[in-house]
């Protein structure tokens, strides 16, 4: 991570690390079942999605769902309902599988046939910072290409260090004031 803003809140500036903002922005591209897991419809949809493929069973295993086939069949037939802990695990498994399933599409959309994606970077919020400590920062936008496959893979793997390295590559294109954008209030794009 770039250096001078390591102690972000020292003068009451508010924001988050660029790597975190990058992960959040990718996460916001993932859509799925809107019904809550504890609703009849939400549970049924998640169970159908998870039991359709071997990858779904692997996602349930990663989420810590270790029930007998008989119990799983009872859930699918709506004869029994999972307890709260298993509902949370089912939801986690669903979103884990959903992320993995949409990764290829995300890479395709963000790479945009080699054209990349225009990213808007909003600087840290300095409204609470005393005037003498404020920096003159404006929203910046730049076209980002060549990093999206790595970024999506790092996001899937929850690899914060790799996302941080990617963010540093992105902000290098901002020129001499890149360091001021190591922390941001938000980033966004339309992909």
Feature map (PLM): residue ranges:
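Recognition helix of helix-turn-helix/homeodomain-like DNA-binding domains
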Residues: 64-82
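Basic, amphipathic alpha-helix used for nucleic-acid engagement in HTH/winged-helix/SANT-Myb modules
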Residues: 1-42
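Intrinsically disordered, low-complexity, charge-dense segments enriched in Lys/Arg
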Residues: 2-5, 12-20, 103-191
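Short, charged amphipathic recognition helices of the HTH superfamily
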Residues: 50-63, 68-70
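Short, amphipathic alpha-helical "recognition" segments used to contact nucleic acids or chromatin
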Residues: 35-55
């Amino acid at each position: 991570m770039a250096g001078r803003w390591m102690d972000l809140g020292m003068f009451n500036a508010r924001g988050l690390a660029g790597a975190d903002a990058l992960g959040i922005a990718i996460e916001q591209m993932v859509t799925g079942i809107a019904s809550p897991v504890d609703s009849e419809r939400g549970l049924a949809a998640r169970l159908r999605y998870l039991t359709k493929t071997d990858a779904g069973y692997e996602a349930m295993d990663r989420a810590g769902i270790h029930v007998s086939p008989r119990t799983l069949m009872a859930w699918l037939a709506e004869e029994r309902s999972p307890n709260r802990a298993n509902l949370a695990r089912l939801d986690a498994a669903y979103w884990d599988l959903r992320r993995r399933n949409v990764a290829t599409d995300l890479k395709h959309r963000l790479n945009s046939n080699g054209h990349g994606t225009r990213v808007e970077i909003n600087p840290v919020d300095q409204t609470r910072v005393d005037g003498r400590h404020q920096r003159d920062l404006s929203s910046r936008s730049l076209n980002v290409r060549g990093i999206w496959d790595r970024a999506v893979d790092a996001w899937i793997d929850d690899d914060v260090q790799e996302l941080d390295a990617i963010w540093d590559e992105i902000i290098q294109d901002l020129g001499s004031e890149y360091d001021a954008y190591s922390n941001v209030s938000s980033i966004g794009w339309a992909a």
